[in-house]
Every structure is written in C-alpha cells, then in structure tokens.
Regions:
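Conserved catalytic or regulatory cores that recognize and/or transform ribose-phosphate-containing ligands
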Residues: 1-184
Length: 184
C-alpha cells in the first residue's frame, strides 16, 4: 500500500491489482479515522493506492507507507484533492473509488470552528451526488448513523443513482465494497 498525502501531485497509474481509493470525510474534529481506514484497507489489499487529504508528517504511525510526507507546494490543497477525487471517482477506465466516511465529531478533539463540523465533507458529497445525476461516479459511503443530516444525504444519493444507496456502518464493509466498486 502506498499513501499519497498533500500537496505534491504525482502521476498515478492505478490498476485492477492496485486501485486508487480516496479517503473523503471530516478531518478537523473527525479524529484520525483516515489512519484506521487505511489500516483496514492494508489488511485486505497490500497493493492499494490511497489518496488521503490529511496533512500527516513523517512521525505518523503510517509514515512507512507514504510516498512522501506532507509537503509544501505552490497549489492549494483543494487542487490536490480535486485531482485525486476526479481520478478515483470520475475518470473512466481508472480502477478507483471515493470513500466517504461520515463519522461523528470527536469528543476529545472537537472541530475548532467557527464553521460547522464536516462542512467541506458535505460540500464534496453534494458535488459528487450532483455528478452522479449526469455521469458514472464510483463512491461508497459509510460511517455512523448519527451523522447529522444523513437521511437527507442518503435520499439525495438514492435519487442521483436511481436506487437505494447503501450505507455501511463498519470500515471493513466500506473497504470491501470500495474495492469491489473500484474494480467494476
């Protein structure tokens, strides 16, 4: 498994054996769920490519899997995120999938504000829901059923995809289904 973190954009060539998974979900106030998800994926598929927008440095517990630690670049982090979100979830012929993890706000390290918890995540999932109304989108959604607004999110996804959109409550289920979607 190789983990790509911001901000350097490097060319990736995902394959069926090494699909690209993008970890989308709350960062500030969300805990380190991305590391937990990466470990679940690593335990299933050691050759997976993971794009993770967390600004992990060389001291992180998964640093041995990094292509390189968080690095400065001329581009905004959003440019990095959009690049890999498109590649994982939209580009045809690319084995990839976006994982949206909608967990609850951390009680020990809550979101500092002033904007609401998971604001960027809601924007991103809304954007890819709109894309799904017009094109093929590869994405899987999981998390905690107590995530505020989940019913509306799942309704919108079901409308966009034309059938009831599945929601997974464990990281193991999310990883399993993301790898299946990535290889379709």
């Amino acid at each position: 498994m190789t983990i790509y973190v911001p901000k350097q954009i490097v060319p990736l060539s995902p394959t069926l054996e090494s699909p690209l998974l993008f970890l989308a979900g709350p960062i500030r106030g969300g805990g380190d769920w991305q590391a937990d998800m990466a470990e679940v994926i690593l335990n299933r598929e050691t050759s997976t490519l993971i794009a993770c927008p967390s600004r992990w440095n060389s001291e992180h517990r998964l640093a041995t899997h990094f292509h390189q630690p968080f690095s400065k670049a001329d581009n905004r982090q959003l440019v990095w995120e959009r690049h890999y979100l498109r590649q994982a979830g939209l580009e045809s012929g690319v084995p990839g999938c976006i994982i949206f993890w909608l967990g609850l706000e951390s009680t020990s390290h809550p979101h500092p504000g002033p904007e609401p918890f998971a604001m960027d995540t809601r924007r991103e999932i809304g954007k890819f829901t709109a894309f799904a109304e017009m094109m093929d989108v590869r994405m899987v959604v999981g998390g905690n059923r107590g995530f505020h607004g989940l019913d509306v999110i799942l309704f919108e996804l079901s409308e966009a995809f034309g059938n009831p959109f599945p929601f997974y409550e464990t990281m193991e289920e999310v990883a399993e289904h993301a790898l299946l979607v990535a290889r379709q």
